[in-house]
Amino acid sequence: MVFTAFILEYWYFTLLSLAAGHFIGKHVYTNYLMRKHHAEPILDVVDDGAFGFKFGFQALKAKKIGKQIDLLFKKFNEAKHPSIGTFVTRSFGMQFIATKDPENIKAMLATQFNDFTLGQRLSYFAPLLGKGIFTLDGEGWKHSRAMLRPQFSRDQVGHVKMLEPHFQLLKKHIIKNKGSFFDIQELFFRFTVDSATEFLFGESVSSLKDESIGYDQEEIDFAGRKDFAEAFNKSQVYLSTRSLLQLLYWLVNSSDFKRCNKIVHKFSDYYIKKALTATPEELEKHSSYIFLYELAKQTRDPIVLRDQSLNILLAGRDTTAGLLSFAVFELGRNPEVWSKLREEIGDKFGLDPDSRIEDISFELLKLCEYLKAVINETLRLYPSVPRNGRFAAANTTLPHGGGPDGMSPILVRKGQTVMYSVYALQRDEKYYGKDANEFRPERWFEPEVRKLGWAFLPFNGGPRICLGQQFALTEASYVLVRLIQSFETLELSPDAPYPPAKLTHLTMCLFDGAPVRIE
């Protein structure tokens, strides 16, 4: 009774004692784990301000003006020991480790793969993407990957001929804007959603077919096509914000978010119903390859089909559109690179009016060395997924970041987040020299750059390496070749700021578009 009265009277002392006990206990246990795992204290601790809320709100503010990824890049450079490339900080109350060290990234993605998971990603992304290959861990992910891997065989990704009808529509839009600057990024997003839906569903949404080039919009609208692209884009904005808020992700669950998800699901369900009403015999008889129909041979579960299709649609549309947009943006401000690329493409496939379109194939595109260098340099400066993260599934370590020189292992507590920045890694002067922030495709012919390994990760690495990377590279290569064959000059608007602001949701593209003039 006396003890209870003492606690009630001196409650503040009791709380302070409990807090101190918790802190001391945590400190002692952390030191024990560090000794057990032969780890050293992390060298760089970046001031996060008020439990990370300062940094969290900085990130939200930067996101609104296309500077979110540059904010993190700046944090790496402002650390006490920027060459170490690993620090610990907080965001919205949650402590996390940030790294651009290739050995740390290799550990998470490959050599210590089982020590790390996607953590809360399913909670962040499930309202739109459900349980698909990009949101699942463990056995669910293994099953998804086994199901999807055959759909990205060389025979499927090598079918470039299906792209030509979509390019012809893209070409009409470019010709329509002849002599003036226009945003080609918007057209690339429409091109890739058209080609991706044809690959996935057997029917294109034909978003490039509009009144401006002579098509009747009412005749080609189906399954909510007109609303789909806008809803898909808005849903990704919401998902990105949920991810930024970490443990507070549930705050982003507005009626508009739910409305957008419903539109996207209704759109995909239209195609899934068509696939499921077809008998197995009808699926086998289909003359051309259709991703969804092949998937329907493995499962008849409409939710599984929808979730996997939307996961692939996200990757198939957004990553390739972003790659094409950044490539054309840089080609437009580097006329010497454009001229050199035209020379290679002219030698391989001819230029209009003598273009040999029928010669363009998966195999020959891979032989265009300067084209590959241009694409690699674009992916280096502007990786489709500029930052990513993993959660520790158990108490473990990362190879670098600790000790007096930052080269000793660091402890990663179970449940702790590690964010890795491919964007910062691929602009590191340690690996790419003093001109690391410059667009210079010629660097890819230098032996030391070709041997960088884990310092170049445009498609991730390890067991979760992107299944569709050849699909994206082939599509981007084909479009660039056809642009070069069809048009002689490419110019970036002099009003376009450089470096460009970058819109980062689940993937990255240009915040202000790619204003170019093509003739």
UniProtKB/Swiss-Prot annotation:
Its EC number is 1.14.14.-. InterPro entries: Cyt_P450, Cyt_P450_CS, Cyt_P450_E_CYP52_ascomycetes, Cyt_P450_E_CYP52_fungi, Cyt_P450_E_grp-II, Cyt_P450_sf. GO terms for molecular function: heme binding; iron ion binding; oxidoreductase activity, acting on paired donors, with incorporation or reduction of molecular oxygen, reduced flavin or flavoprotein as one donor, and incorporation of one atom of oxygen. It is found in: Membrane. Keywords: Heme, Iron, Membrane, Metal-binding, Monooxygenase, Oxidoreductase. Heme binds at C466. Disulfide bonds: none annotated. Gene3D superfamilies: Cytochrome P450. Together with an NADPH cytochrome P450 the enzyme system catalyzes the terminal hydroxylation as the first step in the assimilation of alkanes and fatty acids. Belongs to the cytochrome P450 family. This is Cytochrome P450 52A11.
